[in-house]
Amino acid sequence: MLKVSVITACFNSEKTIEDTILSVLNQTYKNIEYIIIDGASTDSTLEIIQKYRDKIACAISEKDKGIYDAMNKGIKRSSGDIIALLNSDDFYKDEFVVEKVVHEFENKNCDSVYADLVFVKPDCLEKVVRYYESGEFNPKTLLYGVVPAHPTLFVKKAIHERYGLYKTDYKISADFEMIIRLFVVQKISFSYLKEVLVIMRTGGVSARGFKSLLLRNKENLRACQENGIQANVFSMLLKYPRKVMGLFKRGSKGSLKRND
């Protein structure tokens, strides 16, 4: 029975962390190792984590060098066959997510599994703001924004051991760099589940204003260049029409039902 290590990196996440924790603990798949890496929160995040401490395999709180450093700490401490990263603004759509993913790993014998996600407003978690369709990955459509949604990505730990962890000198695009490194350069095998597995609140680390937009494009360009992909500032803009389409697609998906 495959063990899945779910890692949550958090910092001052008192408003959202409980949804994240419960979405993991309520999974029907039971061979889950849950790891929480906190960046020395000063709000009530640690008190909330403590409520569920007996069901969490590992929970540490210490200063770190950012979210990607926290992710790396979690991966290093994990003992699972499969790694999943679920940030403290996000939560699984339902209790069957991990079970479905493990089933896909077993059936397809692949290195990774990913799916779609939806964005919701922090004050209205049932209302879809944008639908992100990951699509079947193809290096040719990379610059058009057709990449696996990182929060939905499950990867065998052996892949990280072979090809490395997240680059901590990136501020908000180390996830994009990781996807390029694994899917384009190393050509790992994958299976795409055409359904929503993760719900993400708007306003996360990588979605805070115009400065973040500029930084993300700059780091995305750097990630392409470091991995031998030809790209420029203009090619980085090709993904935005697809993002706009995601705004329209939300209407066809309706509202979400929550189980709490």
What residue ranges belong to the model's regions?
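Short secondary-structure capping/turn micro-motifs that flank functional sites
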Residues: I199, R216, Y240-P241
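Membrane-proximal basic amphipathic "stem/tether" segments
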Residues: Q225-D260
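Charged/polar, solvent-exposed surface patches and flexible loops
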Residues: E47, K51, H103, R222, ...
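Catalytic core of nucleotide-sugar-dependent glycosyltransferases
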Residues: E195, R208-F234
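Nucleotide-sugar donor-binding/catalytic module of glycosyltransferases
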Residues: M1-S212, S252
